Amino acid sequence: MGVFTYETEFTSVIPPPRLFKAFILDADNLIPKIAPQAVKCAEIIEGDGGVGTIKKITFGEGSQFGSVTHKIDGIDKENFVYSYSLIEGDALSDKIEKISYETKLVSSSDGGSIIKSTSNYHTKGDVEIKEEHVKAGKEKASHLFKLVEGYLLANPNEYC
């Protein structure tokens, strides 16, 4: 098994505490509300929403995938760090065993956030992951993030 790591970083004008509440802690409610074409629904299969919880994410009509299953690996509300693993679903091919993600929000000098994301692709055998596939997924995630950011800017009293 190989592990391929990809890191991305982008910025937001929203401070980490507010962004973490919306984009991480309440994503299962907020994203289907503001982007139903991307995520139809999220449901907890097992657990209480904390570490070890298993969730099924069902994608919207326009998605190339039907659904995926996530396992929450870590939530650090004080340091704004969230990690989970994609363990089942049609986003995993016969070449990938699982994908682990970590998102960390840190304060930027302008009062906003720097979002640091690390993805670890655990492959079966000696398979290599093509960077263009990863970039396509990152672009979709970035688009969702921008929708959340836009929602927070338009609704300044939410997630305070």
Swiss-Prot record:
Any transmembrane segments, and where? Answer: none
Any one biological process term the GO annotation gives? abscisic acid-activated signaling pathway
Q: Please tell me one Gene Ontology term that the record gives under cellular component.
A: cytoplasm
Name the CDD domains for this protein: Bet_v1-like
Q: Which UniProt keywords apply?
A: Allergen, Flavonoid biosynthesis, Pathogenesis-related protein, Plant defense
- PROSITE patterns hit by this protein: PATHOGENESIS_BETVI (PS00451)
UniProt-listed Gene3D superfamilies: 3.30.530.20
Domain of life of the native organism: Eukaryota
Report the GO molecular function annotations: abscisic acid binding; protein phosphatase inhibitor activity; signaling receptor activity
Would I find Acetylation among this entry's keywords? no
Q: In which tissues is it expressed?
A: Highly expressed in ripe red fruits. Expressed in roots and white fruits. Expressed at low levels in open flowers.
SUPFAM superfamilies on file: Bet v1-like (SSF55961)
Quaternary structure?
Monomer. Interacts with AP.
Identify its protein family. Belongs to the BetVI family.
Q: What does this protein do?
A: Involved in the control of flavonoid biosynthesis in fruits, probably by binding directly to natural flavonoids. Binds the natural flavonoid myricetin with affinities in the low micromolar range.
Name by which UniProt lists this protein: Major strawberry allergen Fra a 1-2
Which gene does this sequence derive from? FRAA2
